[in-house]
Each structure stands twice: as structure tokens, then as C-alpha cells.
Amino acid sequence: MSNSQEMLEALDQQDLTKADHYFQKALVEDPDDLLLELAYYLEGIGFYPQARQIYEKLAPIFPEVNLNLASIASEDGQIEEAFAYLEEIQPNSDSYVSALVLKADFYQMEGLTDVAREKLLEALNYSDDPLLIFGLAELDSELGNDLEAIKGYAQLDNREIYEQTGISTYQRIGTAYARLGKFESAIEFLEKALELEYDDQTAFELASLYFDQEEYQKAVLYFKQLDTISPDFEGYEYGYSQALHKEHQTEQALLIAQQGLEKNPFETRLLLLASQLSYELHQPEQAEAYLLQAQEDAEDQEEILLRLATMYQEQERYEDILALEVYDPENLLTKWMIARSYQETEDLDAAYESYQALVPELKENPEFLEQYIHLLRELGRFEEAKEQIQHYLKLVPDDIQMQELYERL
């Protein structure tokens, strides 16, 4: 039995000391071809230091092992050494194309996608391997060169590439067309991809595209397919619920939103949607509960505060509106509702202060001015009221009641 075989047997027995003993003997005594097989095996099971030691010994005889040395160096984070190994492979070598591809991989890992693309272009001068064309199209897609990417993918046999990579070129072409705003072409290729092989992401992209094109019935069809086949797919419930809502299936839309919240109870946009749907279904308590839940984790409170204030105003819950002031809202409508709530609760001085702060922003809004004028009358600030009425009448000159009020003041 060769030293290499003895080493492998020791590894099977998990006797690392014995394995190392035979490894050292193999380096000295075993023939090169047997050592090469041992190196391939050791690399495959993650024994990189030992594999690297063999490859370095054999590199003068088998220069192609510089590819393996480069891969191991890269795994160890030694990128400069990895490139140095690849430089040992010359253009007249059968391994040169593989070296260029590996260089492209390393450059892409380093974020130098443009340089990676140059290496694949160079490789195509030596080989017309479809996987090179595919790799170039992938890089073009990553770089945003969608037209170039489409040209590349279009050269390839979809089934052949799918069998080798698990990626559909039809799906890639459809996605690229979508980014270019060519939605009809995008849908055509995505549907073709889905016909040949079901894919969660493709179904989601189709559903989303149809929704964006306001073809809600078709969007619902693909979202439902996703919901049936792949209910664990991340994040489809929001779009599905929206599409159902557009189709006037509000109860079902709420159920789907709630289904999404079971997976992710803190997703703000789902909570806001569930609140809206609950309110439309005349479930104000549930609508409020969803908003309050969203408020706990939302980074941006403004929309939530506006919705809460609007709901409270419709229910004449003015004290609850005033309680929102502690969050220091920036939205003008929310601030306006707070000002009005001070007025409704007869805290007129606080109302006056709030209205005054809003005048610069809302002075062109007739409804705001009308409320402000009535407040000024209540406070006995008649000159200020007359001044605001004059401005109001410039905006609404045919308001007879306001003209009469001005004359009375």
C-alpha cells in the first residue's frame, strides 16, 4: 500500500498523527501522479495546507496546479499570492483560459467588476465556451450594462445553461428588460422562463411587474401561485395584499397581510396596510392597534402619526390627538389637527400659538384660514381676524358669509 493510501486510511480512522506521518513519507517517496491525486483529494476535503504543500512541489512538473494554489491562497485571504500563482500560467498553456476566469473571479471579489469583465473578454479570445459568454453577461448585468447583458444571454441555449448553473437566461433577460423599462418584453421572457421551470423569484417578479402595470388580476394570479407553491418565500404578502385590494377583495387582502405579519410581526409597511384595510372594513379598533404596533419600531413616525391623528379626528378623540404632540411631528396636517384639537378642547391660547406657527406654511389654504379666523374671533383678536379675512377673500372671493363677517367686524 502506498504512503498516500496509508494516509487516507489513517484519516478514515481519525488518526491525525499517523496521517501526518504517512503524508511526510508520501512527499518523499510516492510518484508524482499519485501525489497529484492525493492533493486533489485533500483539497476537496479541506486539508488546504497539505494540498498546498504537494501542489508547490509539483508545480514545475504540472504548471496547471497553479490554479489550485491560487484558489487555496484566495481561501486563506492571500489575494496577492493568488494572483502571483496565476501569473505563472502562460498564454500557450491549456490552463490559460481557466487562469483568466479565476482572475476575473478574484477581481470581482475585490469589487473590481470592470477589470473582471476585461479578463473574461480576453478569455473569449481563446475560447467560445458558453459559460464564458454567460459569465460576461452576468458581469454586464451587475454593471448595469443591460443591453450588453441581453445580447450575451440571447446567444445561449437556455436549457443548457440552466442545467449547468441553475439559472434561466430567459429570467435574466426579462429582469434586464424590466430595468430598462421595457415591461412588455420583460413579461414575455419571464413568463417563458416560468413555463420551462417554476422559480419563486421569477413568479414574484412577474407578479410585481403586472402590479406596476396596473394589471391587478394577473398580478393576483402570480402572487396566488407563489402563495400556494412557495408560502415561505420572503416578503410577497405585501404586494399580494395590495393587488387583492385593487381588485376590491378587501377581506382577502387583510387576511394575506395578517399572514405576512405572522412571519414578520414588525414589518412597518404590512402593519400600515393591515391598518388601512381594517379601517376600510369598519374595524377601527384593530386599525388603531396595527398603527400603535407599527409605531413601536418604525424609524419614520410621520405617516403613522398622521394616520392616528386622522382616525382620532374622525372619532372626535381630541385628547388622543393632543397626546401625539409629544412625538414632535413635522407633518403640517398632523400639526394642524393638533392645533384644531386645542381649539376643540377650548385651550384657546395653545390653539392660537399652534395656528400662528402654521400660518407661514398654510396661509394659502382656505380651510385652514377659515378655522384660524374663527379662533381669532373667539379670542377677541378682531383686527387679526380682519387681516386674515382679507387674505382669505383673495383666495375665495365669492364667499358671501366671509364678506359679511368682515363687515360685522
What name fits each language-model region?
Residues M1, D33-L36, E64-L67, V97-S98, ...:
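Start-of-helix register in tetratricopeptide repeats
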Residues S2-K25, E29, D33, E37-Q50, ...:
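Alpha-helical segment of the N-proximal tetratricopeptide repeat
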Residues K25-A26, Y55-L58, E88-I89, E122-A123, ...:
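Canonical positions in the second alpha-helix
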Residues E29-P31, P60-P63, D94, S127-D128, ...:
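Short coil turns that delineate tetratricopeptide repeat
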Residues E37, N68-S71, L102, G135, ...:
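Canonical tetratricopeptide repeat
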